[in-house]
Amino acid sequence: MRDMIWTYRALNNPAARRKWTAFILLIVLAGFGYTAYKIAGGAEVGKSLIAAAIFALFISLYAIITLGKPRHYYIEGDYVYYRPFKTNLKDIEGFEVDEERRVIRLKGAGIFSVRTLYFDNEDDLRQAVRRLERIVKR
């Protein structure tokens, strides 16, 4: 039995939306930079621009899917899970709540663990804060 489950979409959370938008823009800029490099190196302009346009189309579709995809977190016992990561909440040093951006940052979480918890609504955020306070204080 899971203690708490919540879902968020990156499109509905300002912090997650900003993170994913920056990542997607970085990919698009890298693609267009590579196209400019190929054209400067003497590649055929028409073919290069067609390839860049197709690349931009696929990245745009990826962005739409990524921003709209529901992501699930759950707290079970002393662990928080976000596939494929899990974090033992007793091992963290504390957490920081940003209610405006609906984010909880776990301090002291390892590199292969959940470090940021995103939320769509403030009710889930408050509920998670209460559960985290109980677990971290033990």
UniProtKB/Swiss-Prot annotation:
Transmembrane as UniProt keyword: yes
Any single Gene Ontology cellular-component annotation: plasma membrane
Membrane topology listed for this record: Multi-pass membrane protein
Entry's localization field: Cell membrane
Transmembrane segments: 21-43, 48-65
Keywords: Cell membrane, Membrane, Transmembrane, Transmembrane helix
The protein, known as: Uncharacterized protein AF_1999
Organism: Archaeoglobus fulgidus (strain ATCC 49558 / DSM 4304 / JCM 9628 / NBRC 100126 / VC-16)
